[in-house]
Amino acid sequence: IRPAPPGARMTQDQLKQAIAFFHHWQASDPHHEYLALCFDVCHQAVMFEDCRQSLESLRQAGVPIGKIQLSNAMICRLPSDDPSRCVQVLDVLGSFAEATYLHQVQARDVRGRIQCWADLPAALAACASQPGRYPELRVHFHIPLFSEHLILPELGGSQMALAQTFDFLAAHEDVRPVLEVETYSWSVLPAPVRPSDEQAQHRGIRDELRWVEEQLRQRRLLQPQAREVHADAL
């Protein structure tokens, strides 16, 4: 089951609801062992949630985690002391607004309050009309997992959320969900970072998988491959 509250993101309130649902299901259905939760890293990052803490809460509550969708949200940091640069950053961020998918946005304002918008154009308009109010935007746009920056230094990814997720898995040998790379937005990336053809997209997907492998390897989460023994060596 993939939690889908408004905007398809799991806040602490929805996390409690998910835990309550699984407790009810486990108590009432003898087939509950076939049901598990699907956890989307991008969604948690957009909500300013700590993925490791969320996963720890689920594990401690006995909620089975069947799948983790590895996805990289976009983070935009707006320079409040440079209005002209802020305009430039918003202009480039606007190139990620497209009609195929909704790109929900969460922002933390200068007072620490959270503001949300259903799609990127509304967030851009709010930031343009209230310069300096929102120093950081988090955008539900699945960028390649290995991307630390896109086009401008102010436009980055939420790799810290992915690191929190991998660190959780490294700490708990009893949690081994399916890991699914969920970057579905290659074809709608802005032209400067969009794959030029199918082969380029295949290379991007390959590089994502290699990046994930390296993160797992660093945390000793990959089983060593058995050494091949060729018949002519026997």
Describe the residue ranges of each PLM region.
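Eukaryotic N-terminal low-complexity, Ser/Thr- and Lys/Arg-rich leader segments
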Residues: 227-234
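Generic marker of "main functional regions" within proteins
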Residues: 49, 75-80, 106, 111, ...
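Residue-level marker of intrinsically disordered, low-complexity segments enriched
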Residues: 87-90, 150, 227
